[in-house]
Amino acid sequence: EIVLTQSPAITAASLGQKVTITCSASSSVSYMHWYQQKSGTSPKPWIYEISKLASGVPARFSGSGSGTSYSLTISSMEAEDAAIYYCQQWNYPLITFGGGTKLEIKR
């Protein structure tokens, strides 16, 4: 089983600040996907196949990486970006998720 470790577990960013969330895999993976979850809702697909934005995702989001190291970046934090973000990989037949990164607004 491939283990995904996200860093940081919790972070706070000011509006307009650049934010980077990392996801480290215990073994090399071909693709990494990211989900966004807001309180009381199910996780939504956010970035798929490393860098492709899901429908409706703002262009300030981007994804990158290869091998065992991947990241999600927000170029300029907005209030609506406060959420929990999860990385996810599929190594047949197992799907694994990272532990999540809670992103809050720094006030």
UniProtKB/Swiss-Prot annotation:
This is Ig kappa chain V-VI region SAPC 10. Residues 97-106 are annotated as: Framework-4. It holds the Pfam family V-set. Residues 56-87 are annotated as: Framework-3. Coiled coil: none annotated. It comes from the Eukaryota. Keywords: Adaptive immunity, Disulfide bond, Immunity, Immunoglobulin. PROSITE patterns: IG_LIKE. It comes from Mus musculus. This chain was isolated from a myeloma protein that bind galactan. GO terms for biological process: adaptive immune response; immune response. Residues 88-96 are annotated as: Complementarity-determining-3. Residues 1-23 are annotated as: Framework-1. Residues 49-55 are annotated as: Complementarity-determining-2. InterPro entries: Ig-like_dom (IPR007110), Ig-like_dom_sf (IPR036179), Ig-like_fold (IPR013783), Ig_sub (IPR003599), Ig_V-set (IPR013106), IgV_Light_Chain (IPR050150). Disulfide bonds join 23-87. Residues 34-48 are annotated as: Framework-2.
